[in-house]
Regions:
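Conserved residues in the N-terminal Rossmann fold of short-chain dehydrogenase/reductase
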Residues: 83-84, 124
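N-terminal Rossmann NAD(P)H-binding glycine-rich loop of SDR-like oxidoreductase domains
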Residues: 39-58
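Conserved NAD(P)H cofactor-binding loop of Rossmann-fold oxidoreductase domains
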Residues: 107-110, 148
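C-terminal substrate-binding subdomain of Rossmann-fold SDR/epimerase-dehydratase oxidoreductases
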Residues: 206, 223-293
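Catalytic helix-loop patch of NAD(P)-dependent Rossmann-fold dehydrogenases
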Residues: 117-132, 143, 151-197, 202-204, ...
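N-terminal Rossmann-like NAD(P) cofactor-binding module of classical short-chain dehydrogenase/reductase
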Residues: 101-104, 145
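Conserved Rossmann-fold cofactor-binding substructure of NAD(P)-dependent oxidoreductases
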Residues: 84-101
Length: 293
């Protein structure tokens, strides 16, 4: 099973890009020794955060701030220092950030369903927690690279989505990310805190887990269990899927870019239908899976 999951995780419909005001240079991904010497990753025990912390830990001093409410302690790289704490507690954040060059802020309520059931907690973590991170960065003199989301746009008016697309979020999650995204850019404009907001599209890869881990993981689990892949509707609805390793590269590029105070979309720029995705999953799992609408 792990072999099949790995095979799918390495399957990419297209190479990713980060589009915005001039774009990010993905060649500047830390391979040339330009990684920050000391970094803090909030939410570093989660899916994307643990991948990022693992890359940063190769060459530098990495701290992970995570309350482990949804993160996995075992996902934190051995070379990283785990600080168990919550971004809603300012003192925990500023202590963890002391002496770092960059704060990669990924800690968040990430489930749309959870945000609908508890919008107050979502706002506390995603908005107030982000302001705490920005204040800590202001105090210690660090850059902030913020994990925003394509959910800030709501249903897109045009494809591919550009960073200038009107923001009409349709969930408390999307609204909280839009508010935090605005705070991130406002802190650079108001306080000269260098910031970059990265608006992730649908991220997939190894280590993704949980009830809201995404359609790719759900399809793969059913394929490996010999069950039909259930597609809701006609299957022609589209998503932009981006591999977690490309998201890591975007974060590393954002840590060194001179073009701060702005936002970038992180995706492939290509829409994949759910029907196409079902075929990709079946091929990756090497099974003749039934697709049921």
């Amino acid at each position: 099973m792990n072999e099949f999951r790995t095979r799918l995780a390495e399957t990419r419909p297209d190479e990713a890009s980060a589009s915005g005001a001039g774009g990010l240079d993905f060649a500047s991904d830390g391979q040339g020794g330009d990684l920050p010497e000391a970094a803090l990753v909030t939410g570093g025990a989660g899916f994307i955060g643990s991948h990022l912390a693992g890359r940063l830990a190769i060459d530098g001093d990495v701290r992970v701030l995570d309350d482990l409410s949804t993160g996995d302690r075992d996902a934190v790289p051995e070379a990283a220092t785990l600080i168990q704490g919550d971004v809603t507690d300012y003192q925990s954040v500023v202590r963890a950030a002391e002496g770092v060059d960059v704060i990669f802020h990924l800690a968040a309520v990430v489930s749309v369903e959870e945000s609908v059931s508890d919008p107050v907690e979502t706002n506390l973590t995603n908005v107030d927690g982000t302001v705490n991170v920005l204040e800590a960065a202001r105090e210690v003199g660090a850059r902030v690279v913020f994990a925003s989301s394509a959910a800030v746009y709501g249903p897109p008016e045009t494809l591919p989505v550009t960073v200038d697309e009107p923001q009409t979020p349709r969930s408390p999650y999307g609204a909280s990310k839009a508010a935090a995204d605005a705070y991130v850019r406002a802190y650079e404009a108001s306080y000269d805190v260098p910031t970059v907001a990265l608006r992730y599209f649908n991220v997939y890869g190894r280590g993704q887990r949980g009830p809201y881990s995404g359609v790719i993981d759900a399809f793969l689990g059913r394929a490996l269990d010999g069950e039909p892949l259930v597609v809701h509707g006609d299957g022609e609805q589209t998503r932009d899927f981006v591999h977690v390793s490309d998201v890591v590269r975007a974060n590393l590029a954002a840590a060194t870019t001179d073009d701060t105070g702005t936002a970038y979309n992180v995706g492939t720029g290509r829409s994949v239908t759910v029907n196409e995705l079902a075929s990709i999953v079946a091929a990756a799992a090497d099974v003749d899976a039934e697709v049921r609408h």
